[in-house]
């Protein structure tokens, strides 16, 4: 169970980082 939670949080974290990186590339 803990692995599933960790994977879910990690994928969510990766998505947030991808969105931030995308926004930075668009705004600059």
From Swiss-Prot:
Tell me what this protein is called: Vasoactive intestinal peptide
Which PROSITE patterns is this protein grouped with? GLUCAGON (PS00260)
* GO terms (BP aspect): adenylate cyclase-activating G protein-coupled receptor signaling pathway; epinephrine secretion; mRNA stabilization; prolactin secretion; regulation of protein localization
The PTM Threonine amide maps to: 28
Keywords attached to this Swiss-Prot or TrEMBL record, sorted alphabetically, are:
Amidation, Hormone, Secreted
**Where is it predominantly found?**
secreted
Q: Which PANTHER family match?
A: GLUCAGON-FAMILY NEUROPEPTIDE, VIP PEPTIDES
Q: What GO molecular function annotation could you give as one example from this UniProt entry?
A: type 1 vasoactive intestinal polypeptide receptor binding
Q: What is the lineage of its organism?
A: Eukaryota, Metazoa, Chordata, Craniata, Vertebrata
Family the UniProt entry places it in: Belongs to the glucagon family.
Report the Pfam families cross-referenced here.
Hormone_2
Q: Does the keyword Secreted apply?
A: yes
Could you say which residues form the signal peptide?
none
GO cellular component terms?
Answer: extracellular region; neuron projection
InterPro entries in alphabetical order: Glucagon_GIP_secretin_VIP, VIP/GHRH-like
Localization (cell): Secreted
SMART domains, per the entry: GLUCA
Residues spanning the membrane: none
């Amino acid at each position: 169970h803990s692995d599933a939670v960790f994977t879910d949080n990690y994928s969510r974290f990766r998505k947030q980082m991808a969105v931030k990186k995308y926004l930075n590339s668009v705004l600059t």
